[in-house]
């Protein structure tokens, strides 16, 4: 790589130095392909599931919030978990190294009088620039106040409540909203994710839920999670047929970078009543609210085999849909409305995805180079299903990167003086010490908002090194990083805290007459008003004289008025105290002869 010489001035707040180094592992761990949702109503099962599969997961989406109006996002978690404050699970997830990207649903449509959803409430809010700006501000406040890594929007009412005739209008409003929210989030170094039902290539004649405008928002969003489930709801059938999901993915990657696309997988199944004989009790048992043809119940995948065994059913795998199914009969005994004993028998049909289903869907990640899969929801899966995902993740595991910084140790120990030319070098290799050449590389600094920002971009040399000459402008936490590829992970060095001292210039006289009042002036750089300047004095008798203190003006200038009453040697040193931007800074000692 041809080296480019550039001097950079960087200003940032100091953060603590991470002293541990990144080391290579003997074997590549699984590719982190799994994401998913942690609902507020199932924390006891969903959180342990997410925490126990950290080798597969890089991010999670707490399903805890709903947008109620333009100024209000309601916390659904706290009322549902009064004895388990939100700080607890957030701390666990952060300790696991997960990015936390909570989901916000559309809660604007609830009619308090009828209890039924009212169409177009959110769409109309997005039509108004002032309301749209308020929603953006409300979301930003939620993200920043909780130090989330981004936000996920799950606004399904556009698809399932609003009339089809409204979709073209909603699409325009949605795109404008996404543009404004994206700009605001990205300005803070945060991510924007959207979760939507499937869309399809318009050329096929089946556009799907096109109001979510995948092509138009592709450059604005960081992630798309496709809800490749709920294909069958009102009548028995597969939850999310593989070919149906594949068509949505094929279209998605044609309009959105595949590295942004996640395919949703269901951790649940459905159990439909297909026929009923006899007179059913008025109070059916177990999870059914009603026993009638067409009514379905939702169950967790991990209960599927138990359900089948309880009724002597044998699940069969349907290769066309890549899902399992079985049928059974269930008899309900109880009391009729008139008080007499009664019973009915319901024929039921079950569909769900199992470990084989998850394997086939996880394989789509390699086929299309997708970001991953997203489970609705963590905690519903059979353990074998995650074993299946792990097997796929291991088979497509990317190479690890060994990254290190080779720099002058004084940068992070005693520090350097402002204006001192330095250079910083990162070295990037594979675990077998093969240099990673030609990789896009970046020098980054840590901002006050906790986000890393590129300040210099380039590429690694043939020997895997990346060198940048730097003129540091203040204390800063820095690192070097190379971009990941499909076959290799992103690689970043241990953060380095660079310590910088101010420059203090002043010119006291070499000698002065005893008892004569005189003024000495100087300047602190960088120029800034209000910097505390201390003058330390030691007389020829080695006795300390009370120090003097002043502050700088807008140009960094300062002055002291002195009067050495008795002859002798007076040694002076000017200093500025340590603060967030600079370490303790001292001028050289200067001796003034007093005659």
Region spans (language model):
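Glycan-recognition patch characteristic of GH18 chitinases/ENGases
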Residues: 27-139
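Conserved, mostly hydrophobic/aromatic
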Residues: 60, 153, 224, 263, ...
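Beta-strand-rich domain onsets/edges
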Residues: 398-432, 497-527
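Enriched for extracellular/lumenal, surface-exposed ectodomains of secreted and cell-surface proteins
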Residues: 472-493, 566-586
């Amino acid at each position: 790589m041809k080296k480019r010489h550039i001097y950079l001035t960087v200003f940032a707040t100091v953060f603590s130095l991470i002293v541990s180094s990144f080391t290579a592992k003997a074997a590549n761990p699984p590719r982190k392909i799994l994401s998913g949702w942690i609902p507020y109503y199932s924390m006891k099962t969903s959180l342990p599931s997410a925490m126990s599969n950290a080798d597969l997961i890089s991010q999670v989406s707490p399903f805890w919030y709903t947008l109620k109006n333009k100024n209000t996002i309601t916390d659904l978690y706290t009322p549902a978990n009064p004895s388990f404050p939100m700080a607890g699970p957030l701390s666990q997830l952060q300790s696991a190294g997960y990015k936390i990207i909570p989901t916000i649903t559309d809660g604007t449509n609830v009619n308090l009088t009828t209890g039924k959803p009212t169409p177009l409430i959110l769409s109309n809010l997005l039509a108004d620039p002032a309301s749209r700006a308020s929603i953006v501000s409300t979301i930003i406040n939620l993200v920043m106040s909780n130090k989330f890594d981004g936000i996920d929007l799950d606004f399904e009412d556009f698809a399932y409540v609003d009339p089809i005739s409204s979709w073209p209008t909603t699409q325009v409003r949605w795109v404008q909203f996404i543009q404004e929210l994206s700009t605001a989030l990205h300005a803070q170094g945060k991510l924007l994710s959207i979760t939507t039902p499937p869309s399809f290539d318009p050329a096929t004649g089946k556009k799907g839920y096109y109001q979510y405008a995948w092509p138009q928002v592709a450059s604005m969003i960081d992630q798309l999670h496709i809800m490749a489930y709920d294909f069958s709801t009102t009548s028995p059938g597969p939850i999310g047929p593989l070919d149906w999901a594949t068509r949505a993915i094929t279209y998605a990657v044609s309009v959105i970078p595949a590295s942004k696309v996640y395919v949703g997988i269901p951790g649940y199944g459905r159990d439909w009543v297909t026929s009923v004989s006899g007179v059913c009790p008025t109070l059916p048992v177990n999870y059914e609210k009603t026993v009638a043809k067409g009514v379905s119940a939702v169950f967790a995948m991990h209960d599927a085999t138990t359900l089948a065994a309880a009724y002597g059913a044998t699940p069969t795998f349907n290769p066309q849909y890549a899902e399992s199914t079985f049928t059974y009969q269930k008899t309900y005994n109880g009391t009729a409305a008139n008080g007499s004993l009664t019973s009915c028998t319901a024929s039921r049909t079950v569909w769900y995805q199992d470990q084989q289903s998850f394997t086939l869907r996880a394989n789509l990640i390699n086929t299309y180079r997708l970001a991953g899969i997203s489970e609705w929801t963590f905690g519903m899966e059979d353990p074998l299903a995650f074993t299946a995902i792990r097997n796929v993740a291991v088979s497509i595991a990317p190479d690890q990167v060994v990254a290190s910084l080779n720099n002058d140790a004084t940068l992070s120990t005693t520090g350097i003086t402002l204006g001192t030319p330095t250079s910083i070098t990162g070295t990037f290799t594979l675990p077998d010490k093969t240099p990673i050449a030609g990789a896009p590389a970046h020098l980054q600094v840590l901002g006050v908002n906790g986000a890393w920002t590129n300040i210099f971009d380039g590429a690694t040399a043939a020997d895997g090194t990346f060198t940048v000459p730097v003129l540091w402008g203040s204390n800063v936490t820095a690192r070097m990083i190379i971009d990941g590829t499909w076959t290799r992970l992103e690689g970043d060095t241990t953060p380095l805290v660079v310590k910088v001292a101010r420059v203090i210039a002043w010119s006291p006289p070499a000698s002065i007459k005893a008892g004569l009042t005189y003024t000495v002036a100087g300047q602190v750089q960088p120029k800034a008003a209000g910097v505390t300047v201390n003058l330390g004095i030691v007389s020829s008798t080695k006795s300390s004289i009370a120090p003097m203190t002043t502050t700088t003006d807008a140009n960094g200038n300062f002055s002291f008025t002195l009067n050495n009453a008795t002859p002798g040697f007076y040694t002076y040193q000017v200093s500025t105290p340590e603060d967030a931007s600079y370490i303790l800074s001292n001028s050289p000692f200067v001796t003034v002869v007093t005659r």
